């Protein structure tokens, strides 16, 4: 006889789902960060099912906006992301996924999707008078 799967195993916990503020496509931004160095590795998107899979498996699963399908980081490349912690931001519209990244995180082969992509920015200093 096959094992019985509870409805809770098939859905994201109601306590978590109620706290998420999704965009019009039902997605939440997921910032992925190396757990020990705090290096920002990439940004992906998750719906409830991608988050449920991530929390249950310990490997990061995203929802591809362009392909409209789930993908688990590293299944093709071998560059897996092992989950260390997941946090929800104060507004409930973004996740911070702390991982142990094995190999490059970016599909271009770089460690981070943000490597060498700094935009030129200049902010002029502003003097603020101290309050007496």
UniProtKB/Swiss-Prot annotation:
Q: Which cofactor does it need?
A: Mg(2+); Zn(2+)
Provide the binding site for Zn(2+). Answer: 90, 106, 113
EC number(s) stated in the UniProt entry for this protein: 3.5.4.19
Keywords, A to Z?
A: Amino-acid biosynthesis, Cytoplasm, Histidine biosynthesis, Hydrolase, Magnesium, Metal-binding, Zinc
Q: Which reaction does it catalyse?
A: 1-(5-phospho-beta-D-ribosyl)-5'-AMP + H2O = 1-(5-phospho-beta-D-ribosyl)-5-[(5-phospho-beta-D-ribosylamino)methylideneamino]imidazole-4-carboxamide
GO biological process, alphabetically ordered: L-histidine biosynthetic process
The enzyme's main class, written as a single word, is hydrolase
Q: Which InterPro entries match?
A: PRA-CH (IPR026660), PRib_AMP_CycHydrolase_dom (IPR002496), PRib_AMP_CycHydrolase_sf (IPR038019)
User: One GO cellular component from the entry?
Assistant: cytoplasm
What positions does the entry give for Mg(2+) binding? 89, 91, 93
Pathway per its UniProt entry is: Amino-acid biosynthesis; L-histidine biosynthesis; L-histidine from 5-phospho-alpha-D-ribose 1-diphosphate: step 3/9
Query: Gene3D superfamilies recorded for this chain?
Result: Phosphoribosyl-AMP cyclohydrolase
Q: A GO molecular function for this record?
A: zinc ion binding
Q: Where in the cell is it found?
A: Cytoplasm
Q: Which Pfam families does the UniProt record give?
A: PRA-CH (PF01502)
* Cofactor binding summary note: Binds 1 Mg(2+) ion per subunit.
Q: Which family does it belong to?
A: Belongs to the PRA-CH family.
Matches recorded under HAMAP family: HisI
Note the subunit structure.
Homodimer.
Q: What is this protein called?
A: Phosphoribosyl-AMP cyclohydrolase
Q: In which organism is this protein found?
A: Renibacterium salmoninarum (strain ATCC 33209 / DSM 20767 / JCM 11484 / NBRC 15589 / NCIMB 2235)
Q: What gene does this protein come from?
A: hisI
